[in-house]
């Protein structure tokens, strides 16, 4: 952090947005429509971020997309689902800010910027009480970024890739004045800006911060974007900003190993199970894929096997990542459980016992000892399929505390003039624990808070 009351940049703009993922691009669209001259600085050679690595699913209630599909949902119910999952540990005002604004943001992106959304209504994601996962037609995060990038280009918003922001500039009275960017060749650029929006996500790629705040995942596979180096947290500490829930994160218990491909949790929600190398189940797969990362990593060899059938394989093929896993030969099939166990190199007897147990539970529509409900319509039938998986860290959920206009708050309760945060740079809605993550919380805060931050620029700064 540099202090320079006389700072003058090579470039002068109204709003510098650090990060070119869903949060940053949404903020850029909103800020530009507010009349701001915007620069998006992206450290990589193309726009991507954690969004491009995700499935691109955005939860929202009472949207136009839901109405078109005759899905009756409410923001009140969505709010309750989030709070129940995080055990009421997140700030309800912050959660409400996200729930209210994600509806506005998605309807706006669709109506004003031509981004086509539909709602996935084949299955419910863990702990959601309604169909509310919105996606673009391709159902990938990369496609979502592409739509946002095209919208940004249509507004002639300036995007500068290969520009890594390495320092912020503030005045002696604490106002943000600009930043210093660095190019791959080592050259630097000074940027004067009335406002800065931090859209640089969290710190999943910073091993020191992970060891400090999430030690249980310091040796896990990191499945997020390598550029998530925690600048928001580092700069926030230097600015004496309020920071919370740094122990919170999204994990995932279903990453094909060693292929490194995400395998959709829809397979578990619609009847699949996970077993360890001993052929035994070890948890309630319906609690959530985030906390399942820890459960899988606690198993022998830190691996598990997803077991499913032809019906679920067809469901999986609706997702590009699953199709990639098939092409990579990560998916194993067999006509019998005995053959499947042999192919997986796990004990035949215990796996057969497990399958008999879950079949009996399904036949009786019963609840198992882990608390999972089984039902007869989702009984697994031959041929059987399996994929070897491990647990992974996806992205962190703690960050800078902001107000309802996305302004960063200091420990003394005042605002850092000119500084805003959204997405993973801001504290999320999942609370301080891995189990608090509700499916889609990442893109929920990225797009809703990006929208809030961009819209706030005109009202406060310009």
Task: Label each region the model flagged.
Residues 9-10, 29, 322, 398-462:
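C-terminal structured subdomain/cap of oxidoreductase catalytic cores
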Residues 184-255, 443-452, 456:
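Glycine-rich loop(s) and the adjacent beta-strand/alpha-helix scaffold that form part
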Residues 15-40:
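N-terminal Rossmann-like FAD-binding beta1-loop-alpha1 element of flavoenzymes
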Residues 2-6, 37, 43-158, 162-164, ...:
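Conserved N-terminal/central alpha/beta ligand/cofactor-binding core
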Residues 233-346, 350:
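An anion/pyrophosphate-binding glycine-rich loop and adjacent beta-alpha core
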Residues 1-15, 33, 462:
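Extreme N-terminal leader/targeting segments of oxidoreductases
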Residues 167, 350-433:
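A glycine-rich dinucleotide-binding beta-alpha-beta segment and adjacent secondary-structure elements
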Residues 161-175:
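A conserved short coil-to-beta-strand element within the FAD-binding core of flavoproteins
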């Amino acid at each position: 952090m540099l202090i320079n009351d006389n700072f003058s940049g090579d470039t002068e703009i109204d709003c510098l947005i650090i990060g070119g993922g869903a949060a940053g691009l949404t903020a850029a669209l909103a800020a530009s429509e507010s009349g701001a001259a915007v620069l998006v600085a992206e450290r990589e050679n193309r726009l991507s971020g954690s969004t491009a690595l995700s499935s691109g699913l955005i939860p929202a209630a009472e949207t136009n997309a839901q109405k078109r599909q005759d899905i009756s949902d409410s923001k009140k119910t969505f709010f309750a689902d989030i709070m129940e999952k995080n055990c009421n540990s997140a700030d309800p005002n912050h959660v409400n800010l996200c729930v209210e604004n994600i509806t506005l943001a998605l309807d706006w992106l669709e109506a004003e910027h031509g981004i086509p959304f539909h709602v996935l209504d084949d299955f419910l994601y863990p702990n959601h009480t309604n169909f509310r996962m919105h996606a673009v037609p391709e159902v990938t995060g990369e496609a979502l970024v592409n739509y946002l990038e095209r919208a940004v280009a249509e507004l002639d918003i300036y995007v500068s890739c290969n520009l890594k922001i390495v320092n912020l500039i503030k005045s002696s009275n604490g106002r943000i004045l600009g930043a210093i960017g660095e190019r791959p060749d080592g050259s630097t650029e000074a940027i004067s800006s009335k406002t800065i929006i931090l859209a640089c996500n969290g710190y999943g790629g910073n091993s020191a911060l992970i060891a400090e705040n999430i030690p249980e995942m310091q040796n896990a596979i990191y499945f997020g974007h390598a550029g998530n180096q925690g600048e928001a947290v580092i700069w926030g500490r230097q600015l004496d900003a309020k920071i919370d829930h740094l122990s919170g994160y999204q994990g995932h218990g279903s990453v094909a190993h060693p292929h490194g491909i995400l395998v959709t949790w829809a397979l578990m929600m619609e009847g699949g199970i996970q077993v360890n190398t001993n052929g035994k189940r070890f948890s309630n797969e319906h609690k959530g894929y985030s906390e399942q990362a820890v459960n899988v990593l606690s198993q022998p060899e830190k691996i598990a096997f997803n077991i499913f059938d032809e019906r679920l394989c067809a469901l999986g093929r609706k997702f590009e990542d699953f199709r990639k896993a098939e092409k990579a030969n990560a998916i194993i099939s067999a006509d019998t459980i005995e053959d499947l166990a042999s192919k997986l190199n796990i004990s035949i007897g215990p796996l057969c016992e497990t399958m008999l147990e879950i079949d009996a539970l399904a036949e009786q529509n019963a609840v198992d000892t882990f608390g999972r409900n089984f039902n007869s319509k989702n009984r697994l039938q031959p041929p059987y399929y399996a994929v070897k998986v491990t647990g992974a860290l996806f992205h962190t959920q703690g960050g800078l505390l902001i107000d309802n206009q996305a302004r960063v708050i200091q420990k003394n309760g005042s605002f850092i003039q000119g500084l805003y945060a959204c997405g993973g740079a801001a504290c999320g809605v999942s609370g301080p624990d891995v189990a608090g993550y509700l499916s889609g919380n990442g893109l929920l805060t990225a797009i809703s808070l990006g929208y809030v931050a961009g819209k706030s620029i005109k009202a406060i700064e310009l």
